[in-house]
Design a protein with these regions (language model features):
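Short, solvent-exposed secondary-structure boundary/capping segments
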Residues: 120-128
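A glycine-rich beta-to-alpha transition motif near the start of alpha/beta enzyme domains, typified by
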Residues: 1-120, 160-272
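Extended Gly/Ser/Thr-rich low-complexity repeat segments
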Residues: 137-144, 267-272
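Short secondary-structure junctions
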Residues: 8, 137-139, 146-149, 258
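Ser/Thr- (and often Asn-) enriched beta-sheet segments in non-cytosolic proteins
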Residues: 102, 111-113, 139-141, 146-148
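Glycine-rich, charged/polar anion/phosphate-binding loops
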Residues: 134-136, 144-148, 177-179, 189
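Ligand-binding beta-strand-loop-alpha-helix segment within the catalytic cores
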Residues: 130-132
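Internal active-site segments that recognize and position negatively charged phosphoryl groups
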Residues: 141-168
Length: 272
């Protein structure tokens, strides 16, 4: 039996490989979801704590619509992990009984497919669209260092740094500086990438508006696309992150198909 749809001031919390989100239906809220309230709700000490908020919206030429709100109150164009969480939420809470449907985001419309086992969602596959990969490497001067990177868009911006020597300490130092670098007037997501073999990459992630995260679907797609374009990997690609692994397939037309889990945590009522 599905869980009930969200009622007045309720939310659902889920994570995808440790990347956690709150899911909210704005129509049920008794107060406006302002940037100030978003920052409070996402705060790990003063609020519920999350890497962002997903809101259920009317679909734009799609079955459902999704907005992705960052912990700093800004809005993201697309989130691979957020999409998987959102798609499972729709099925688990009875908004749809279909296993295939479409979702519109500010970064474009995506198609989703749910893999069920015993009536429960096991994995979610999302066609993330095509990646736009920079034709040549670029260089940014950051903290006295020249950092070579690949510029990628998968509906949202990414700065992919392919360098096996980079550590988590480097990510925490370079991530916020690259995110706000003048080369990225709208800010950017940052990935530090190591190519493990011809079908595997390992990445550390700094998300625009959120900071370090354990996993990111769109970052995985961007990093894999950059490595594929440079001839470092071939499809299929496994993206290994601190929170877990994602499977990526690059279709002949350039579409990126992402498959991974999403895990419900709890449902509650907002009092803040």
């Amino acid at each position: 039996m599905p869980l009930p749809k969200l009622s007045r001031d309720e939310f659902a919390k889920s994570h995808a490989l440790g990347n956690d989100y709150l899911v909210i239906d704005p129509k049920t809220l008794s107060w406006p979801l302002t940037p100030e309230r978003i920052r409070l709700l996402c705060h790990r000490n003063l609020g519920l704590g999350s890497d962002g908020i997903l809101t259920l919206e009317p679909g734009k030429d799609a079955d459902f619509g999704l907005r992705i709100l960052n912990p700093d109150g800004s809005e993201a164009e697309k989130s691979g992990n957020g999409l998987r969480i959102f798609c499972r939420f729709l099925h688990d809470h009875g908004y749809t009984d279909r296993t295939e449907f479409t979702v519109s985001t500010p970064g474009g419309k995506v198609s989703a497919k749910l893999d069920l086992a015993g009536g429960e969602v096991r994995l979610i596959t999302v066609d993330m669209g095509k990646a736009e990969v920079g034709a040549s490497d670029e260089t940014a001067e950051v903290a006295g260092r020249k950092i070579r990177f690949v510029r990628v868009s998968v509906g949202n911006p990414h700065c992919v740094v392919i360098d096996p020597s980079l550590t988590r300490e480097d990510l925490l130092n370079l991530g916020p500086r690259l995110e706000t670098h003048p080369l990225f007037p709208n800010r950017t997501n940052v990935q530090c990438v190591t190519v493990v073999d011809g079908h595997t990459i390992r990445l550390l992630i700094w998300e625009r508006g959120a900071g370090e995260t354990m996993a990111s679907g769109s970052s995985s797609c961007a990093a894999a696309a950059a490595c594929l374009k440079r001839g470092l990997v071939e499809s299929p690609v496994k993206a290994v992150m601190p929170g877990g692994d994602l499977g990526l397939i690059f279709l002949p037309d350039g579409m990126i198909r992402m498959t991974g889990p999403a895990t419900p945590v709890y449902v509650g009522r907002l009092l803040l």
